[in-house]
Amino acid sequence: MRLPLFVLGLSFLLLFSACSNVDLIATDSKTIQEHLSNYKGEKAVLLNVWATSCAPCVEEFPMIVSLGNEIKDLEVVFVSADFDDQLGEVKSYLNEQKVTGVSFIKNENDQSFINGIHPEWFGSLPFTIFYGKISGKILIFWEGKESESKFREAIQRAINE
């Protein structure tokens, strides 16, 4: 009886792993900044810090994913502010939203993380930053949920700078 349950469990684990198209990496703000610098000269970057428990984050999330899929000069990077013990929940949500590639979950204390992402960020979620394609510098940032039109304006500016 134990062997069939083991095989069933292993099959489920392999199936779940095969369905996952996102690499969720627990890391600190310094490593995230280093990752973002790789896109300078190649793509504009939209960095979105969110959490599964944040209603405005969850509301705007599908729109951000859609923009990332639509606009080829844009790299969308998601950073979860959830706690380490929510790793499974975060990965499941990212897979539900069909996020691919690399996403991050913070693994440093809140204040160090906030200061490392942006010195003018007060910690409210969602938090969004746009980095210029050419310059690689921060051009625009905001706290809170915003409209698709505001995102599109910021993306266009980031692609051109």
Set out the residue ranges of the language-model regions:
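Positively charged n-region of N-terminal signal peptides that target proteins for export
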Residues: 1-5
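Bacterial N-terminal signal peptides
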Residues: 7-17
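A short beta-strand-turn-helix
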Residues: 23-45, 65
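Short pre-active-site segment immediately N-terminal to redox-active cysteine/selenocysteine motifs
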Residues: 43-45, 49-53, 83
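Conserved redox-active cysteine motifs that mediate thiol-disulfide chemistry
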Residues: 49-66
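Structural microenvironment flanking redox-active thiols in thiol-disulfide oxidoreductases
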Residues: 61-97, 110-114
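Short, internal strand/loop/helix patches
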Residues: 94-125
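Thiol-/selenol-based redox modules, centered on thioredoxin-like
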Residues: 125-161
